[in-house]
Amino acid sequence: ASLRFGKMPRIQRTQATLVVAPMSLLSQWRTELERASLPGTLSVDLYYGDVREQLAHKLSHGNTDVIITSYGTLTAEYKQHEKRGSSVLFSGTWHRVILDEAHTIKNRSTIAARAACRLQADRRWALTGTPIQNRLTDLYSLLRFLRVEPWGDVRFFNSFLAKPFASQNAKVLDIV
């Protein structure tokens, strides 16, 4: 009930890592993390659906090392946070946020991209084999998420990279 009424615990700062991945990869992430660590040394939890409230309390007490969630859950939590200011994922600062299949946020105007960029973290990783799928601007959201300045500023990115690239500027073509 507290999930619906905005009474989730607030996390100021955590040493936990948040992994955001497509739903189809959540179990694989958990399996790989557990396989790569000694038994009992790493607490890994999936954060989606009905278990979110239980895991929110566990996280608020520092009883988990890695939370794995989907882009769908991230966007749902972001919407909730925007409406009520109540969301575990957005209530504090993570030690590390990892986006798997990070090209998922390629369109900066999508809720998933805005949500990913809004997460607070000491460290940020973006994992993708295709940082540019269709347009050079696909790269912008990744740079913004990673907080690579000044490239994470859309005006700077467009002025010094996207527009010169579109006009076939030789120097920019060499950079890209």
Name these PLM-found stretches:
Residues 1-99, 106-107, 161-167:
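SF2 helicase/translocase NTPase motor core
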Residues 96, 104, 113-176:
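Conserved P-loop NTPase motor "coupling/switch" region that bridges the ATPase
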Residues 110:
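Short alpha-helix within the catalytic core of nucleotide-sugar-dependent glycosyltransferases
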